């Protein structure tokens, strides 16, 4: 959890702030919560189930969903239902800086934080937006693609196969030596 976060006065009077205000009270509350949430990070890209928003703002599920939808419509953030990841578009710029020099040690910290994020569809757009500003070096792609149920597991290397067969033969022969003559295993 962060110790502090920066909120610009532009939140209330900037173009996005005005959009949020016209979208309603829930949108403003959700937007402010997303910037100051104890679950947030400096990137503005983090895990945020809607239930957290509902509970911690007191808006309830309906109010939180409405506020989040309106904040998205206002261009404040994006939300992925499947991964429950939110991206507050300008948060990294406000929390970190507009631009960092390549030798700034924060660049490594930002890259590490980015690398540690779970797979989600905001990874590539985040990198594209902040690559130059924060000297990011490694772009991640959403890797939530799983193998098709039709696909068979990959075949082991020949040496692995031989080792497994030898191990099975050894276990089977030692188990047989312990059994009395004429004993038939039924399980």
Give short role names for the model-derived ranges.
Residues 1-13:
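Long, low-complexity, charged/polar intrinsically disordered regions in eukaryotic proteins
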């Amino acid at each position: 959890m962060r110790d502090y976060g920066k909120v610009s006065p532009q939140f209330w009077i900037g173009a996005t702030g005005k959009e949020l205000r016209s979208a309603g009270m829930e949108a403003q509350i959700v937007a402010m919560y997303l910037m100051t949430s104890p679950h947030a990070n400096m990137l503005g890209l983090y895990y945020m189930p809607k239930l957290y928003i509902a509970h911690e703002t007191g808006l309830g599920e309906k109010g939180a969903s409405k506020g989040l939808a309106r904040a998205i419509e206002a261009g404040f953030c994006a939300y992925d239902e499947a991964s429950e990841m939110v991206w507050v578009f300008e948060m990294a710029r406000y929390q970190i800086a507009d631009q960092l020099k390549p030798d700034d040690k924060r660049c490594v910290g930002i890259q590490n934080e980015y690398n540690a994020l779970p797979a989600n569809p905001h990874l590539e757009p985040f990198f594209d937006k902040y690559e130059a500003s924060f000297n990011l070096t490694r772009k991640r792609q959403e890797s939530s693609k799983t193998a098709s149920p039709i696909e068979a597991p990959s075949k082991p290397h020949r040496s692995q196969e031989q080792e497994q067969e030898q191990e099975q033969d050894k276990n089977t022969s030692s188990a047989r030596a312990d059994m009395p003559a004429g004993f038939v295993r039924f399980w």
